[in-house]
Every structure is written in C-alpha cells, then in structure tokens.
Amino acid sequence: MTSTLPPLPDDASAATFVPPPEAVVAAPFDQLALPAPVLANLTRLGYHLMTPIQAASLPVALAGHDLIAQAKTGSGKTAAFALPLLQRLDARSFAVQALVMCPTRELAEQVTQEIRRIARAEDNIKILTLCGGTPIRPQADSLAHGAHVVVGTPGRLMDHISRGSLKLDSLATLVLDEADRMLDMGFFDDIAYVAKACPK
C-alpha cells in the first residue's frame, strides 16, 4: 500500500508545524510503527482510519519530533498526542514521564479518560489528574505513590511543582492542549513556570 502520510522533517531540533489537517489524506493506523497490541486496542476502540489531524501529526510525533498543530474539538487530537507519549513511557519507572496541560478541569478530565482508554494495551500505566477545585493533599499523596502521566491545569501544576510534590526530572513529553485558550485565559506565567521546571 502506498503511504498517504506526510513526509517527516529533516531537523528534529525545532518544532514542526504540521500541514493543515484538510491537506492530509486519511490513512489506516497500521501504516504507523505501533506495536500489534496497540493497534488491536485501537481497533477495539473504533479507531480504524486516522482523522486528518492524526495523519498529519502522528508520524512526526512518533519519530520524536516536537510539533505545533491546530485542530477543532472532536477532531481526534487527544489520540494524536496520547499515542506518541504512551510509546515513550517506561512502564517500569513510576516517575512522571509525560505532562499534559489543559485550560480547564473539565477538559483535563476528558483528556485523562481518553488517554486511559488508549493506554489499555500497555501494562500498569498510571495516569493522574491534577486540577484546582479539589483538595491538594490527596493529589500529593497520589503523586508520592508514583505516576507515569499527569494531566492538569496550569495553576494546580504550578502549585505541586512549588511544593515539591510534582517532580519532572524524568519528563520525556510535554503537551500544551489548547495552548491558545490557556494564553487567552491569562495562564502565560503559569505555563512558563511549569516549562522552566521541565528538563531541557
């Protein structure tokens, strides 16, 4: 089968702007270099053909490139970043290896649920949601027991970093979901604080 996926960039040192989703032809997930159990789980979940944003971004992200992408709600963008971040996890290490920042608690909870669904093919992947509006101490206790992926809002993530309960020394993936909305909501300083705490 001839690949309909976009070519990969030559330079992995800079963020790649993926092509507009409407310019990418949908392709099956088995064109991606994903393990068989992951592909089987995607089929069980009803993922057959990649959406345009998935086809545009997954090959780039799975190859280890940073990227900047834009897509509408309901376009499948969560899977577009969840699959690559899950592939980079070391399940044997319960240090935080992936961090997803979202503008609201509601979106963070939705993202967490979708990542959990996609992670079913992996063994013992722990995903935590850290948002305001709930007590911080139970969240800190959960972090102390270890987690692979953290999804949260900027302010609460900043709180945990400043308290020392969220350590990002082992972080491999940082996702800003709806970054434009977070900036519109005045989270620039919070995002900058969290980003500064991430490994270079």
Please provide the spans of the model-predicted regions:
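Conserved nucleic-acid-binding Ia/Ib motif block in the N-terminal RecA-like helicase ATPase lobe
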Residues: P37-H48, S93-S162, S170-T173
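The conserved Walker
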Residues: A71-S75
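Amphipathic alpha-helical protein-protein interaction surfaces
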Residues: L34, F94, D123, D184-F187, ...
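N-terminal intrinsically disordered, low-complexity tails of helicases
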Residues: M1-H65
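Hydrophobic beta-strand scaffold positions of dinucleotide-using enzymes
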Residues: Q54, A69, V150-T153, D177
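Walker A/P-loop NTP-binding motif
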Residues: A55-L67, T78-S93, L99, E109, ...
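Conserved alpha-helical segment in the helical subdomain of ABC-type ATPase nucleotide-binding domains
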Residues: V60-A61, S142, L166
